[in-house]
Amino acid sequence: MSTVATTPKPDIHGAIRELWNHRAQDYDREPGHGIRTTREEWAWRRILAAAFDRVQTETPLRILDVGCGTGAMTMLIANMGYAVTGLDLSPEMLAVARDQAEERGLPITLMEGRADKLPFEDGAFDVVFSRHLLWTLPRPRKALGEWARVTRPGGMVAVSDGWWEEPGSEMRARRAIGGALRAVLERPSAASAAYRQLRPSLPLAGGLSPYSIRYYLDHAGLERIVVRDLKTIRAAERRSMPPWRWIDQARFTWIATGMVPE
């Protein structure tokens, strides 16, 4: 009796974990990753406070920062007075986050785990927040369903991301010029090559338009969806970017919020 050899499925989550492990030590130096200036910090504070104020509660909000990475947003949220838990796939990213939280004396819970397979009970949080995560996920719809599951009725899912590959001849030209300048002026990154290999497994690698994120949040069962342009964040980020990075900076980054039905 003959047997048919089967090809094992690639461990996509393991590959993603290794990519972010590799980037952990220098991740915050990238514009748009770490919060680099006071102007940027306060721009985020205003935006998040306006979003989270939509959630009614008599106690400090319980917030999950999913895909927290090195903890830049986790610590900002903690400094705003919220009870925050950070979760990330990468243990090296979490190690950086843990060191920074301890250095600042912030009471943050940090856990390793997958964004599409959360280790929490239904309704465990008032808010689930993510920044620059959705585009990195092999199963973004499943992840959004999980985020809605662990958010209590009347709570909020808040997603911040961007339209990284906005169509149109102008943006294609800007990306080409910006990429060429980075190739000359910046040290080549091994992570970039690893990302190119992963890209076919990431359905949202090019980002999402404001119309697309509305569809995804609606599909996850959320309601009262609001999408806000993050132009104040982009303006603050530019102040700490080298000039060649301005050229292909995404023209539309956003924060989208949706409420879990009561």
Regions found by a protein language model. Name each.
Residues 2-58, 72, 156-188, 231, 248:
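Conserved class I S-adenosyl-L-methionine
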Residues 62-66, 70-117:
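Class I SAM-dependent methyltransferase SAM/SAH-binding core
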Residues 129:
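A conserved beta-strand element that flanks and buttresses the S-adenosyl-L-methionine
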Residues 141-153:
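A short glycine-rich, Lys/Arg-flanked "PGG" loop and its adjoining helix->strand segment in the class I
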Residues 203-221:
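Short alpha-helix
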Residues 220, 240-262:
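Core SAM-dependent methyltransferase catalytic element
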Residues 222-233:
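Conserved S-adenosyl-L-methionine
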